[in-house]
C-alpha cells in the first residue's frame, strides 16, 4: 500500500511539473515546502502565474500556491453588473473578457470567453470554496484580495466601483464565514482606503492592508503592504524597521529576483509576509537559510 501511495504521489508531482515553466525557478520547484507541515510567509502574486504556466487569478494557479504551502495567494477582484464579485485582473485597466464588468453579468462575461486553460472566469465564491475544503487546502492558505482601481486611458473610472467591490466581497466573505481566510489589499492614495478601512476592519472583522508608503501612525489598524523600492531602495523615507518597531505589520512586494530576495530574507522572521511572482524560488531560498 505504501508503494502504491508513493507511485500516486510521484504521478501527481509529475503532472504539476508538466504544467510549469522551467525558467526563473530552481530545479526542484515543484516539491512541497519544508517538512510537509509548515507554511511559508510567502504570498503568490496572482497565484504565482509567472512561475507556473497557468492563467493568473485561476483556480489552477490558486492550487499551485496551495501546493507550495504559501501563506496566501493574491488575486484581483471586480464587481459585476449583477452584484457579484469576479476574480480577474482587468485588461487595459478596466476590462474582463473585453467587457466592462460593472455593466455586465457574470454569465455575460463568462460567455465572452474562458481562461487559457479552459476554466471559466472564477467568482470569489469559487475561490473561497477551494480554500474551505480541507482536502484541497489542508494548510489553511489565505486569499489576499486586491481591490483594483479601475482606469481607462490612464484615468481613474468612478472610484465607487472599487469601493462597492470591496464591500460586496466583505458580504460574501461574511456569508461564507471565511473572514479568517481572506484579507484585503487597498491601493495607494486615500480615495478607497479612507472610505473602507474602518468598516472592513471593525464591522466585517477582516484584515486590510494599505499600499501607500507613509508614516507608521497613518495605518491605524491596517497593515503596510509596501513595494521593495519604497523601503529598501535608495533615498527612502522609511525603512522596514520603522514599521516593525512601531508595531505595524509589514509585507513587502516586488521581491522577484536574487538581489531583492536576498535583501528581504534577513527580515523574514519579523515580516507579515513576502509577496512575489516567484513563490517557489523564494521558498527554496528560505529553506536554504533554515526557515
Where are these regions (language model features)?
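Sec-dependent bacterial lipoprotein signal peptides
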Residues: 1-18
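Phosphate-group recognition and catalysis centered on beta-loop-alpha active-site segments
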Residues: 20-291
Amino acid at each position: 500500500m505504501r508503494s502504491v501511495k508513493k507511485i500516486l504521489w510521484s504521478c501527481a508531482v509529475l503532472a504539476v511539473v508538466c504544467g510549469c515553466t522551467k525558467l526563473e525557478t530552481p530545479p526542484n520547484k515543484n516539491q512541497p515546502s519544508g517538512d510537509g507541515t509548515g507554511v511559508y510567509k510567502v504570498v503568490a502574486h496572482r497565484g504565482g502565474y509567472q512561475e507556473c504556466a497557468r492563467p493568473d487569478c485561476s483556480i489552477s494557479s490558486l492550487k499551485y500556491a496551495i501546493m507550495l504551502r504559501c501563506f496566501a495567494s493574491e488575486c484581483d477582484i471586480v464587481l459585476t453588473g449583477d452584484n457579484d464579485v469576479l476574480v480577474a485582473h482587468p485588461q487595459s485597466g478596466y476590462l474582463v473578457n473585453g467587457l466592462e464588468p460593472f455593466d455586465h453579468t457574470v454569465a455575460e462575461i463568462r460567455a465572452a470567453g474562458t481562461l487559457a486553460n479552459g476554466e471559466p472566469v472564477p467568482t470569489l465564491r469559487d475561490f473561497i470554496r477551494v480554500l474551505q475544503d480541507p482536502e484541497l487546502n489542508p494548510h489553511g492558505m489565505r486569499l489576499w484580495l486586491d481591490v483594483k482601481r479601475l482606469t481607462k486611458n490612464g484615468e481613474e473610472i468612478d472610484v465607487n466601483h472599487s469601493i462597492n467591490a470591496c464591500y460586496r466581497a466583505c458580504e460574501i466573505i461574511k456569508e461564507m464565514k471565511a473572514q479568517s481566510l481572506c484579507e484585503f489589499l487597498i491601493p495607494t492614495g486615500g480615495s478607497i482606503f479612507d472610505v473602507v478601512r474602518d468598516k472592513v476592519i471593525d464591522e466585517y472583522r477582516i484584515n486590510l492592508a494599505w499600499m501607500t508608503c507613509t508614516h507608521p501612525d497613518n495605518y491605524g489598524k491596517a497593515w503596510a503592504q509596501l513595494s521593495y523600492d519604497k523601503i529598501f531602495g535608495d533615498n527612502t523615507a522609511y525603512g522596514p524597521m520603522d514599521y516593525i518597531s512601531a508595531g505595524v505589520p509589514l509585507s513587502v512586494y516586488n521581491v522577484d529576483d536574487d538581489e531583492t530576495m536576498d535583501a528581504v530574507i534577513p527580515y523574514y522572521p519579523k515580516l507579515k509576509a513576502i509577496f512575489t511572482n516567484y513563490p517557489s524560488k523564494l521558498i527554496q531560498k528560505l529553506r536554504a537559510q533554515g526557515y
